[in-house]
């Protein structure tokens, strides 16, 4: 991981710096493979961490997690440590049980440069009143997606949306689902930017739920 430097007066980025057009162009982890309740999960990569968004359809008896790790390691820490999650190791594989929907990180040998975040959230179905839908298995480039009154934005599990979301003086907005909103096109590599990733100004009755938000140029929301 390169050193990240905060710039209080970053160079303005007026247009997205790049686009992605297929899942083949998305950055995937080559360090971790994750399975939850027998279902293989997509594991994404950034230069600061790896992450696996997991949409859970009902907790039932919790979540059984298996992680296959491609490099040798000795020590493992699952955080927050206050959760008291115990793991079982077999060679390069870890297994543990999450008693409910929660978000945890897995650290290897105290290395904070490549943790794995397992981000569990309840599965959110597409509402009938959806006005903007990003579908599973597709990559989108929205630059700045401007919302209006009563917009319902649905990011389906398995969708990746590159860009940011903006609204001003709007009412009854929803941004929901289990997909990913990625703000990396809006800042220079290894530096911050000036724009909020989800920028909702003087809006009323706003719901944001379920989505995974990463790599913002500034504050996420």
Q: What positions do the PLM features span?
A:
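Extracellular/periplasmic carbohydrate-active domains that bind, remodel
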Residues: 1-221
């Amino acid at each position: 991981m390169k050193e990240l430097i905060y710039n209080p007066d970053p160079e303005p980025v007026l247009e997205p710096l790049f686009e992605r057009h297929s899942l083949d162009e998305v950055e995937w982890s080559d360090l971790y493979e994750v399975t939850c309740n027998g279902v293989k999960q997509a594991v994404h990569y950034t230069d600061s961490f790896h992450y696996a968004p997991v949409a859970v359809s009902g907790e039932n008896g919790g979540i059984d997690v298996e992680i296959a790790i491609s490099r040798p390691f000795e020590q493992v820490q699952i955080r927050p440590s206050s959760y008291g999650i115990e793991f079982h190791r077999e060679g390069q594989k870890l297994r543990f049980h999450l008693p409910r929907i929660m978000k945890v990180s897995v650290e290897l040998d105290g290395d904070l440069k490549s943790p794995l975040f397992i981000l569990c959230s309840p599965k959110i179905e597409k509402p009938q009143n959806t006005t903007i839908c990003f579908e599973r298995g597709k990559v989108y480039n929205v630059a700045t997606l401007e919302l209006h009154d009563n917009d319902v934005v649905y990011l389906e599990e398995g969708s990746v949306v590159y860009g940011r979301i903006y609204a001003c003086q709007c009412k009854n907005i929803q941004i929901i689902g289990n997909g990913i909103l990625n703000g990396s096109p809006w800042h220079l590599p290894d530096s911050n930017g000036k724009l909020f990733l989800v920028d909702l100004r003087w809006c009323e009755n706003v719901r944001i739920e379920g989505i995974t938000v990463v790599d913002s140029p500034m504050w996420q929301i």
